[in-house]
């Protein structure tokens, strides 16, 4: 008997996304679609979007962690573009990676050149035993 007369109900397994199979939060399917539509190559392998999504997720997590630390240092509970800028520019590798990137509303790193800083005075007594003859520039 071929069993054509019996109605066998096959329960289809619940669809599992490629992101969940890879243990990622970033969408593997969307990355795959963007790779195909972007005219980067004629064909895109099955592992390429998984790898790219994992790399993007890692970089995002790294930047967000550093930006969260910058926000906490400034006693803020919300990350703003300034915190992203501080996070990226204070990290050597991220700064090299994102060297040509401008972050809108990010500002600049506080930096004063060493030659512009005031000279350190030597306690007021010179080597000859007399008091230093430096006068203030206030008139």
From Swiss-Prot:
Protein's cellular compartments: Nucleus; Chromosome
Keyword vocabulary terms for this entry: Acetylation, Cell cycle, Chromosome, DNA damage, DNA recombination, DNA repair, DNA-binding, Isopeptide bond, Meiosis, Nucleosome core, Nucleus, Phosphoprotein, Ubl conjugation
Pfam families the record matches: Histone, Histone_H2A_C
InterPro entries: Histone-fold (IPR009072), Histone_H2A (IPR002119), Histone_H2A/H2B/H3 (IPR007125), Histone_H2A_C (IPR032454), Histone_H2A_CS (IPR032458)
PTM notes: Phosphorylated. Phosphorylation of Ser-136 (H2AX139ph) occurs in response to DNA double strand breaks (DSBs) generated by exogenous genotoxic agents, by stalled replication forks and by meiotic recombination events. Phosphorylation is dependent on the DNA damage checkpoint kinases ATR and ATM, spreads on either side of a detected DSB site and may mark the surrounding chromatin for recruitment of proteins required for DNA damage signaling and repair. Widespread phosphorylation may also serve to amplify the damage signal or aid repair of persistent lesions.
Residue list for modification N-acetylserine: 2
A GO molecular-function annotation: DNA binding
Region described as Disordered: 1-21, 119-139
PROSITE patterns with a match to the protein in the record: HISTONE_H2A
Motif ([ST]-Q motif) on chain: 136-137
Modified residues (Phosphotyrosine): 139
SUPFAM superfamilies in the record: Histone-fold (SSF47113)
Gene Ontology cellular component list: centrosome; chromosome; nucleosome; nucleus
Cross-link (Glycyl lysine isopeptide (Lys-Gly) (interchain with G-Cter in ubiquitin)): 14, 16, 120
One of the GO biological process terms: meiotic cell cycle
Cell cycle listed as a keyword: yes
Sequence similarity: Belongs to the histone H2A family.
Function: Variant histone H2A which replaces conventional H2A in a subset of nucleosomes. Nucleosomes wrap and compact DNA into chromatin, limiting DNA accessibility to the cellular machineries which require DNA as a template. Histones thereby play a central role in transcription regulation, DNA repair, DNA replication and chromosomal stability. DNA accessibility is regulated via a complex set of post-translational modifications of histones, also called histone code, and nucleosome remodeling.
Subunit and interaction comment: The nucleosome is a histone octamer containing two molecules each of H2A, H2B, H3 and H4 assembled in one H3-H4 heterotetramer and two H2A-H2B heterodimers. The octamer wraps approximately 147 bp of DNA. Interacts with numerous proteins required for DNA damage signaling and repair when phosphorylated on Ser-136.
Domain-related comment: The [ST]-Q motif constitutes a recognition sequence for kinases from the PI3/PI4-kinase family.
Record protein name field: Histone H2AX
């Amino acid at each position: 008997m071929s069993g054509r007369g019996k109605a066998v109900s096959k329960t289809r397994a619940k669809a599992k996304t490629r992101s969940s199979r890879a243990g990622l939060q970033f969408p593997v399917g969307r990355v795959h679609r963007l790779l195909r539509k972007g005219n980067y190559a004629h064909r895109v392998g099955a592992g390429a979007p998984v790898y790219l999504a994992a790399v993007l997720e890692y970089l995002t997590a790294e930047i967000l962690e550093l930006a969260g630390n910058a926000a906490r240092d400034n006693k803020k509970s919300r990350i703003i573009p300034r915190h992203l800028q501080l996070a990226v520019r204070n990290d050597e590798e991220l700064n090299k990676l994102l060297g040509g990137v401008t972050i809108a509303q990010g500002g600049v790193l506080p930096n004063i050149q060493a030659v512009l800083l005031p000279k350190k005075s030597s306690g007021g007594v010179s080597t000859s035993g007399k008091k230093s003859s430096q006068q203030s520039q206030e008139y």
